[in-house]
C-alpha cells in the first residue's frame, strides 16, 4: 500500500522518496476506506501536494491551465454533442472532460433524456469549464476555486433544479466543494435508476450478464453502489 511506504519515508525524512510516492498516489480512497482510526489518506496526499512542507514544489500537475481558464476542458475544446434546447429546461447536464473524451456515454445519456421526455441543457455548450477536480487533486486550490466559482455562476443562472453528471470525478467535487443550495446534484446512474423506478423509461432486459466496475470516486468516494446495479440488473 502506498500509504505504508509514504509514512515510512516521512519517518526517515527522505524528501526525494516522499515526493515520488506522494506524486504517484491515484487518490483512489482505499487507504481511507480501510484505515482503522479514520485517517483520510487521500486528503493528506492532496495537502502534501499543496504545501512546501518537505522542501519541494507543490506543483505536481502538467495540466495547461490556460486552456481551462479559457473555457476548454482537459481533453477536447468543444463538446461532441450538439442538441437544441429552450429557455425553460430544468435539467442541466455537465458532461465534463472524461465524458467528452468517451462520447458514447454522453450520447447515451442524452438519448435517455430524450426518451424520458425531459427538457435539458448541456452546460459544456453554454460556458461551462473543467469542474476543477484535477487542479484540486494537484494541490492547486486557488485555481480550482476560480473554476468552481465560474461554474457555480453558470449553474445558478441557468435556473436548473437538477445538475446531472456522468463523470464520477466531477460528481465528487460538485457534491463536496460546490455550494449549490436548492439544486440537486445527481450521477447519471442514480438518475437512470430513478427513471426506471418511476416508470418514465422502460428497460428491455437482454438476459445478458454484465461485469460492473465501481469507480473509486463513485463507490468508495461517494457511497453509490446499489443504483448502478439496479439499473443494469
Model-identified regions with their sequence ranges:
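Iron-sulfur-cluster electron-transfer modules
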Residues: 2-166, 171-173, 177-178
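Short, catalytically relevant binding-site loops at active-site mouths
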Residues: 170-172, 191-194, 217-220
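Residues within well-ordered alpha helices
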Residues: 112, 154, 194-195, 231
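Short, flexible loop segments at boundaries between secondary-structure elements
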Residues: 182-206
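Redox cofactor-anchoring modules in respiratory/redox and cofactor-processing assemblies
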Residues: 197-233
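Short, glycine/charged-enriched secondary-structure capping and boundary segments
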Residues: 106-109, 177-181, 200-201, 225-228
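Short, flexible loop/turn elements at secondary-structure junctions
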Residues: 97-98, 189, 216
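A general structural motif
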Residues: 88-90, 159-160, 182, 203-209
Amino acid at each position: 500500500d502506498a500509504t505504508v511506504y509514504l509514512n515510512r519515508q516521512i519517518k526517515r525524512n527522505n524528501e526525494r522518496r516522499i515526493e515520488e510516492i506522494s506524486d504517484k498516489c491515484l487518490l483512489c480512497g482505499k487507504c481511507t476506506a480501510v484505515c482503522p482510526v479514520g485517517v483520510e489518506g487521500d486528503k493528506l496526499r492532496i495537502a502534501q501536494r499543496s504545501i512546501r512542507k518537505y522542501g519541494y514544489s507543490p506543483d505536481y500537475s502538467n495540466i495547461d491551465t490556460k486552456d481551462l481558464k479559457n473555457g476548454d476542458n482537459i481533453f477536447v475544446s468543444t463538446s461532441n454533442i450538439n442538441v437544441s434546447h429552450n429557455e425553460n429546461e430544468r435539467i442541466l447536464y455537465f458532461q465534463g472532460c472524461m465524458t467528452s473524451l468517451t462520447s458514447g456515454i454522453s450520447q447515451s445519456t442524452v438519448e435517455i433524456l430524450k426518451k424520458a421526455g425531459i427538457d435539458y441543457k448541456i452546460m459544456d455548450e453554454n460556458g461551462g469549464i473543467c469542474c476543477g477536480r484535477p487542479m484540486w487533486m494537484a494541490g492547486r486550490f486557488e485555481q480550482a476555486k476560480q473554476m468552481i466559482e465560474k461554474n457555480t455562476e453558470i449553474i445558478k443562472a441557468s435556473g436548473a433544479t437538477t445538475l446531472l453528471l456522468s463523470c464520477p470525478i466531477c460528481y465528487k467535487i460538485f457534491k463536496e466543494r460546490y455550494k449549490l443550495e436548492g439544486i440537486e446534484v445527481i450521477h447519471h446512474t442514480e438518475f437512470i435508476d430513478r427513471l426506471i423506478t418511476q416508470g418514465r423509461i422502460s428497460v428491455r432486459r437482454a438476459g445478458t450478464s454484465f461485469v460492473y466496475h465501481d469507480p473509486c470516486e463513485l463507490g468508495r468516494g461517494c457511497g453509490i453502489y446499489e443504483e448502478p446495479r439496479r439499473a443494469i440488473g
